[in-house]
Amino acid sequence: MLLSAIIIFTSLPLSVFANEGLPYGNDSIISKEIKKVYSDIVLIGGETVKFSAGNVYSFHAFSGEEGYYAVKITYRCSRENSGRPTLSVSVNGETPFSEAQSIQLMQRFENAAELTDEVVRSGRVPEQNEVYEKQTAYLSDTAHFYGSVLFFPFKQGDNEIEFKMEAESIEVSELLLCGGDQTPDYDTLNSSYKYKEYGGEPIYIEAETAKYKSDASLYAVNDSTSAATSPTSAYKKYLNTIGGSSWKNAGQYLEWEIEVPEDALYSVSFRYRQSVNAGMTSYRKMTIDGSEICTELNEMGFKYASRFENYTPYSGNKPILLELSKGKHIIRLEVVIGKLSSVLPEIEEIVSKLNSCYRKIIMITGSNPDSLRDYQLETAVPEVLETLEALRKQLKNIGGYIENVMEGGSAGTKTIGTLTAQLERFSKDAYTITGELSRFKTNITSLSTWMISAKSQPLLLDYMCLSGPNGKIKNAGASLGQSVAFQLSSFIYTFSKDYQVNTKAQGGNTVTVWTSSGQTQLSILRQMIEDDFYNDHNFTVDLKLVTTSLLMAIAAGKGPDMALNVATTDAMNYAYRNAVVDLAEFSDFSEIKTRFRASALTSVSYKDSVYALPFTQSFHMLFYRSDIISELGIKIPETWQDVINALATLKKNNLEFGIPIPSDLNTFYSMLYQNGGRLYNEKSTAAELASYESISAFTQWSEFFTDYQSPKQFDAQNRFRTGEMPIVISDISLYCTLNVLAPEIQGLWGMSLIPGTVKADGTVDHTGSATETCSVMLKNSNKNECWDFLK
């Protein structure tokens, strides 16, 4: 066992580790019998060291024997951070497993104002502020597939461990190598209890009053589906619950500060609803005052419930009791993957391998093969058939496990069963593959979609209750009389309810603002107006959600003072008809326009006049599958000629290059500008599409569809995921879509600027075109107030 440790701290320059590492669960990395070393090695203690973004921090530690260590860290997030701190870890110069490349540390937030009864009844969500307090945690994989702790391999003797801050900065006050916490089961814990059982009245803690949370998105929300929700109203939207779809990702937590009246043993219950993932169970881990309690509370399962139900954790046929001393305590509920954590990484790997097999098949057959032709796949790609058979056996075992732990299965077992049966047909007769290729692709996508939903652990909480084991707690459902009265009152109220998301009256003039944004965005905008804008302005903003035509309202003389989220083409149409205000006439416009890129104002300008301010902007990027283009020997295209060069290799392997469909002219505009052309003349009085540059750009653009047969219609997300289209130009929103909906290709794709055109001086022009919406001010008598709001 370890007798001593040698600790050396150094700060190294930014570097990239060459060894990416295998997955954590790989048998060659972590054996099923992990030998953990339990003597602590202190790397940082008694001092505070700032880990700055971009730096690498190296420590040397002497281990008396070979074994595995967990890393325990006490840290404080830096105030200059804009997101979660992320670090990577290497041991003895190597990344031991791929999960060590990106390890996130949680932030901490609280309500800016206390959630009093008045705030609850107002329906106005308090602003969320980050709390810069010390937190203690074990380094764990970002997806939390492997529980709360990652164990790193150390050899006997001297070891070097390096921490590289990939993003943001933290202040570290303690850093330990240790064996992790040893959590007892409930029977062991119960035998050590000394307090008596609580015999008083049940203690209710409103869930929406959570003191701390891991994300700013975890705030109190309204639920008006039940008369038994506490508190509730048939007429107003009380902030009476917390969680739901915003509390679903592994690692997210909520903390409540509770106070108990005496030293005693308490049973804990929750009123909850989980109506998002049908047939699935959402899991939570409970800790008290920062410590795990027992193994049973590390995976509390909240089953699917379309209506509110009560949940009390049990051990056998008895409720689990918590030994709490008199006074205040912190109860934390953290999202965990639960019983599926052991198979989801395996499914993710299977999806990746199935996509690879599918891609290798279409390299032979094409994506639309002739079902009557025998492509001799047994000879062409025998290794693919062997892989498919191995994956079939894996899926069959996983399906049985899921059916067992989910007590009868779920949508996942049906999806796995369908895919397993198909793979069995492929194994018996490879000739059937071409006829079922489209369904094979669909089944892979279905498995990936289910995997994403299985990772999601949504849970809505109304309240928590502490009572004695025999205490009588409130029913989760309302009585028939309560339900009828509540629903009847709600129905009657609909005849007089104002469905607009208006701000409170402020006094002074009233400015009417229309927007076509969603209800959530509208509520956020309303809150920003009331919390910030009203502090410095003495007039009322009447905010309305309107999806009808603004043009008809203007023509009828019923239009608003301002409109948000308007298409730039519509804004200029109103400008030509003298219906909107030229913003350039305001004295401080020259200062305001510096907030935006000059190009963002081009589409709403004419000569020296500017008729709107940008509201949203979207543009194209180049997305590429790094694994596939590396395999094919294709470099990331920097120019359009690079794309053409890559097309020969892609076509030879029956793969595609995706360029936005002809109805999306942004790619053509990009080529036009890169070739030195423009849409209009200098005075913007005539189009210049007949110029040499314009015709050259149009020819270049159209040849991708005529000469190179790029598909005119395609699903960029799915074809990129499967690898059919390893290079695609798409809207920037695809970045977020892939991060959320394509976990199986995480780390296997990248994003770059759209291809450019080489200039005479050798530089590459990557000029692109953007799609925008804007905010306009209609001609009215409240110009100054409207300008104050708009800017």
Q: Locations of the language-model features?
A:
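Extracytoplasmic/periplasmic substrate-recognition and gating elements
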Residues: 65, 262, 742-791
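Glycine-centered hinge/linker elements that transmit conformational signals in sensory
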Residues: 684-713
